């Protein structure tokens, strides 16, 4: 068993099938646990609930550096480094991967607003080094409380992303140190 600070692939007892919503001209939309009752019921058997749910759409060529050169796409989900976890299901993953970064010594992240218009902390690529990467073609637990970004998008990609919370404290988050407890029967450890 090889522990991992950034991601775990999951072998789940079901297939996540959710119709891709109409995005219009947006790249991100919110939805609720009422939209995925079977998934929420399964999480409840693990002592978890959905705290927040998003769907993100990325188009080929993401990130488009012509558009994003004034905006950092490397970010954490939230305003502080806290190692909180999400579970992601990606449709049309293609060659896309999630990449995690560490700040170079003496460099800092800065307050920002994500593409989802939520508070985040971001960093410039030149201030970072790659720490880990993983293809997004399987259900996975991801540490979004560390700097990360999506790279190598070669087709329109949809990511259903769920921030989880303990069932007995639905306003809290679950943290990376807890995922191996909650998902012990479903994690596929890399050797």
Where are these regions (language model features)?
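Non-heme Fe(II)/2-oxoglutarate
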Residues: 1-72
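Catalytic core of Fe(II)/2-oxoglutarate
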Residues: 112-191
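A generic structural signal for short, non-catalytic loop/turn and secondary-structure boundary residues
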Residues: 2-3, 48, 82, 135, ...
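Short beta-strand-to-loop capping motifs
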Residues: 14, 91, 162-166
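Catalytic core of non-heme Fe(II) oxygenases with the double-stranded beta-helix
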Residues: 63-139
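Extracellular structured ligand-interaction cores
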Residues: 5-9, 71, 82-88, 95, ...
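Secondary-structure boundary elements
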Residues: 46, 92-96, 167
């Amino acid at each position: 068993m090889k522990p991992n600070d950034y991601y775990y692939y999951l072998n789940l007892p079901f297939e996540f099938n959710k119709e891709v919503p109409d995005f219009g001209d947006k790249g991100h939309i919110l939805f609720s646990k009422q939209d995925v009752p079977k998934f929420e019921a399964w999480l409840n058997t693990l002592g978890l609930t959905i705290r927040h749910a998003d769907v993100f759409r990325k188009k080929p060529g993401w990130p488009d550096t012509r558009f994003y050169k004034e905006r950092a796409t490397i970010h954490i989900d939230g305003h502080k480094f806290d190692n909180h976890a999400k579970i992601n299901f990606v449709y049309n993953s293609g060659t896309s991967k999630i990449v995690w970064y560490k700040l170079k010594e003496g460099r800092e992240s800065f307050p920002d607003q994500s593409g989802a218009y939520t508070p985040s902390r971001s960093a410039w690529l030149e201030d970072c080094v790659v720490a880990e990467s993983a293809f997004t073609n399987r259900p996975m637990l991801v540490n979004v409380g560390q700097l990360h970004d999506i790279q190598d998008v070669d087709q329109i990609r949809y990511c259903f992303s769920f921030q989880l919370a303990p069932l007995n404290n639905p306003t809290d988050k679950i943290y990376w140190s807890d995922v191996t407890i909650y998902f012990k029967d479903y994690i596929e450890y890399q050797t």
